[in-house]
Structure formats: C-alpha cells, structure tokens
Design a protein with these regions (language model features):
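N-terminal secretory signal peptides and thylakoid transit peptides that target proteins
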Residues: 1-11
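Beta-strand-loop-alpha-helix segment that lines the small-molecule cofactor/substrate pocket
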Residues: 105, 112-176
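Structured segments of extracytoplasmic/periplasmic soluble domains
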Residues: 33, 42-49, 95, 108, ...
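Conserved acidic residues
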Residues: 61, 100-103
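Short amphipathic alpha-helix with an adjacent loop that forms part of the alpha/beta core around
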Residues: 92-99
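Short acidic-hydrophobic, aromatic-tinged amphipathic segments that line or gate anion-handling sites
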Residues: 84-92
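N-terminal Rossmann-like dinucleotide-binding module
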Residues: 16-80
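Active-site-proximal beta-strand/loop segments in catalytic clefts of secreted hydrolases
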Residues: 26-30, 64-68, 108-110, 149-152, ...
Length: 176
C-alpha cells in the first residue's frame, strides 16, 4: 500500500461508516476570517446563534486548497478532524477511488493572490474549479449538489456555462 493510499483511509472509513453526508471542501485559501473559515469551519465545529448550538449536519471528508496562506488553518483543521488535504479537485471528490465518493461539494473561491482585470475585478478561479468538478461528475456518470460561495463568476459567459452544466447534469446548484 502506498503512503498516499494509507493516509486516505481515515477519510474513507469516516465516509463509509456513518450515515452522515460526506462533503468535499474546495478552497482558494483558508485562514482565520476568510470565507473558507466562515463556511468550512462551521461544517467542522458547528456554530451558535443566540444561546443555541447547531452541530454540523454532515462531515467534511476532504479539503483542496489552491493556495496556502501564510496563516493557513486548513492543514491544522484537517489534521485535527482526520481528513486529507489533497492536491487536486479530482482527489477531493473521489477520495482516491477514481469515482465520485462524496455527497456534496462546497466551493469557496474568495481570497487569495489572483490577478485583476481592467475593471479591477479579482479573477478568482470559480469557473476553473467548477469545470473540474463537472469533469469528475461526467467521468463518474453521476453528480451531487454544489454550493458556490459568492456569485458564480466575474464573466457572464462563464457563469452561464456553470448554470448550464448544472441543468445538463441535473445537480442542485446554489450560490450566494
């Protein structure tokens, strides 16, 4: 058994052994007070509103980060909660099995070092990440719900394509 396969066993065991939904978290970068912290950390630790605690309803089973921030917390949280930080979106969605192995995808593409266009819009790779998600869905012959933080893309054409893929492959898509 290769080291990588061995290190994926805790996430696979967690996913296989519970009736809870398994979520792949895809992030551009993950640090305190980032959008990834606001979303992914709540899926790990739950959250409080007023005096009521809301436990996480599902399990994060993999994390992909496009960039590692100098004050990264993604690696520490992955280690603490027992899921792998992977090097590709495909690995995050397949857990190393070669087929779709999660029940949902969180796409958090906000923050990080990305270029700006002539309108001073930061070109976060939401479309590019989403395209890789879709490739896994197509290869697997099935799809799962996707949540995309913020709007879909800075480009109308790219946003429309993302919407069209969700209709074509019949998966729920939420953004906001």
């Amino acid at each position: 058994m290769r080291r990588r396969s061995f290190l994926q066993l805790p996430a696979a065991a967690l996913a296989a052994g519970s009736g809870r939904k398994r979520i792949a978290a895809l992030s551009t970068t993950y640090h305190v007070r980032s959008h990834s912290d606001n979303f992914i950390t709540r899926f790990l630790e739950g959250y409080w509103i007023d005096d009521r605690y809301y436990p996480p309803p599902c399990d994060i089973v993999s994390l992909y980060m496009d960039q590692v921030h100098p004050a990264d917390i993604g690696n520490r949280l992955a280690s603490a909660y027992g899921f792998p930080v992977v090097k590709s979106i495909e690995q995050a969605l397949t857990l190393g099995t070669g087929k779709l192995a999660v029940d949902g995808v969180l796409q958090i593409a906000e923050h990080g070092n990305y270029p700006f266009n002539d309108r001073q819009q930061q070109l976060y790779p939401r479309y590019e990440i989403f395209e890789q998600i879709v490739k896994v869905f197509q290869k697997s012959g099935r799809s799962v719900p996707v949540f995309s933080d913020k709007h879909l893309s800075w480009s109308w054409t790219k946003a429309k394509q993302m919407y069209d893929w969700s209709n074509e492959l019949k998966f729920p898509l939420m953004a906001g």
